[in-house]
Amino acid sequence: MVKIAVCGAAGRMGGRIIAAISETEGAVVSGALERLGHPMVGQDAGFNAGLGAIGVTISDDLTAVVQGCDVLIDFTTPKVSLKNLEVCGLNKKSIVIGSTGFTPEERALAAELAKDIPVVLAPNMSVGVNVCFKVLADVAKILGDDFDVEIVEAHHKMKKDSPSGTAVRMGEVVAEALGRDYNKVANFHREGICGERTKDEIGMQTIRGGDIVGEHTVYFIGMGERIEITHRAHTRDMFSRGSVRAAKWVVSQKPGLYDMQDVLGLR
């Protein structure tokens, strides 16, 4: 039985993860964590998940929660995730991180900390999205430089980072397949007389509004034809189920930094 703790247990995503753990054979909720001063600290974690009481109290004691689990699932912010990763490292516990918005420097720090424990760091835990990553690489290699690439993503109005971590990863996957440096070819803004589109650029466009869970479309646009590869998330349950799958997988791995491509055996 894999003992899984959840960081951000009182949030929307945290509740869905707790529900997913309860539905997963071979896994159990061992701890629930929230920030200091959160009004749900001290309450049973099952209520936010729609399960009723499950006998696990939401705590603000990070070290105690980590020490009581095999693996921590974290959907917070890069700053909080790195702190949680450090504490997991000190206690030799695995961690699954689904937070987005990491800078290159923060990702490098995560990789350094992952030398001591197995870590899954993925911008999107969905099986479908990770299949898309593989498909995008294959399509980009086949089409080469003859097709322009544009990426459009849409999320709910509460999302804090832009573009989404998934959209960035899609851009990175395509750029790598085409032998380009994503950081040099990504174009996030077009306005006014900005000149013709360059051959190598990858356009990144963002939509924010309402309660959109998540939509991503990658356009491969040629002369007289185009290919669109789209993934639409209808609920957050796919992310929560994916994170639990990653948690069960990572506890048996060697120290290192992994992503969902590793979890799903897509490499």
UniProtKB/Swiss-Prot annotation:
InterPro entries: DapB_C, DapB_N, DapB_N_CS, DHDPR_bac, NAD(P)-bd_dom_sf. The active site is at residues 155, 159. The keyword Cell membrane does not apply. GO terms for molecular function: 4-hydroxy-tetrahydrodipicolinate reductase; NAD binding; NADP binding; oxidoreductase activity, acting on CH or CH2 groups, NAD or NADP as acceptor. It comes from the Bacteria. NAD(+) binds at residues 8-13, 34, 98-100, 122-125. Keywords: Amino-acid biosynthesis, Cytoplasm, Diaminopimelate biosynthesis, Lysine biosynthesis, NAD, NADP, Oxidoreductase. (S)-2,3,4,5-tetrahydrodipicolinate binds at residues 156, 165-166. HAMAP family: DapB (MF_00102). Catalyzes the conversion of 4-hydroxy-tetrahydrodipicolinate (HTPA) to tetrahydrodipicolinate. This is 4-hydroxy-tetrahydrodipicolinate reductase. It comes from Geotalea uraniireducens (strain Rf4) (Geobacter uraniireducens).
